[in-house]
Structure formats: C-alpha cells, structure tokens
C-alpha cells in the first residue's frame, strides 16, 4: 500500500452534501457543519478577507421581497392596510 498520490484516487465517499441554509454542497456530513455558511451555528460564517463572498451574499442581492415592502410602507408613512376614514361633511 502506498500513502501518496495513488491512494487519493481511491477516495469515492462523499464528505459534503447540500446545506439547508445556503444550498451549497458544503455541509460536512460527519462534522455536521457547513464549510460555506457555518450552518448549525447561530450566526452566518463571514470573514472580511472574503470581501467578494460577502458582496455576493449580502442583503439586496436576492429578491428582497420584505425590504421592498418595508420601503413602500416607509414612503407612505407606515399607514395601516385600511384607508383612513373620510371626513363626513358637516351640515
């Protein structure tokens, strides 16, 4: 048996699978931790040396459905869903 380059060709077992949080195939099956987002930890894994990675994943890069709704409500002064009752004309 050799311990060098030839032995690495025999590796065929998957060590990583899909992550529930980020969807990448970076969730380590034995460690139960995602190498990309750090899933199982409460906070998302980010490092400042990965500035490009932060730029790709940050708020505003996806649908931002909730934030668009918040912005629309902000422009209208956070009014409720029901319109204000019209003032009755006084006679």
From Swiss-Prot:
Zn(2+) binds at residues 19, 22, 34, 37. A zinc finger (C4-type) spans 19-37. GO terms for cellular component: cytosolic large ribosomal subunit. Its cofactor is Zn(2+). PROSITE patterns: RIBOSOMAL_L37E. Pfam families: Ribosomal_L37e (PF01907). The keyword Repeat does not apply. One of its GO terms (biological process) is translation. Keywords: Metal-binding, Ribonucleoprotein, Ribosomal protein, RNA-binding, rRNA-binding, Zinc, Zinc-finger. Binds 1 zinc ion per subunit. GO terms for molecular function: RNA binding; rRNA binding; structural constituent of ribosome; zinc ion binding. The keyword rRNA-binding applies. InterPro entries: Ribosomal_eL37, Ribosomal_eL37/eL43, Ribosomal_eL37_CS, Ribosomal_zn-bd. Binds to the 23S rRNA. Belongs to the eukaryotic ribosomal protein eL37 family. PANTHER family: 60S RIBOSOMAL PROTEIN L37 (PTHR10768), RIBOSOMAL PROTEIN L37 (PTHR10768:SF0). This is Large ribosomal subunit protein eL37. It comes from Caenorhabditis elegans. The gene is rpl-37.2.
């Amino acid at each position: 048996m050799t311990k060098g380059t030839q032995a690495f060709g025999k590796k065929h077992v998957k060590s990583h699978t899909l992550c529930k949080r980020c969807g990448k195939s970076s969730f380590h099956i034995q460690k139960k931790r995602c190498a990309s987002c750090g899933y199982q930890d409460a906070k998302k894994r980010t490092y400042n040396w990965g500035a490009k990675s932060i730029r790709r994943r940050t708020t505003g890069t996806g649908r931002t459905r909730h934030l668009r709704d918040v912005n629309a409500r902000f422009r209208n002064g956070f009014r409720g869903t029901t319109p204000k009752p019209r003032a009755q004309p006084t006679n």
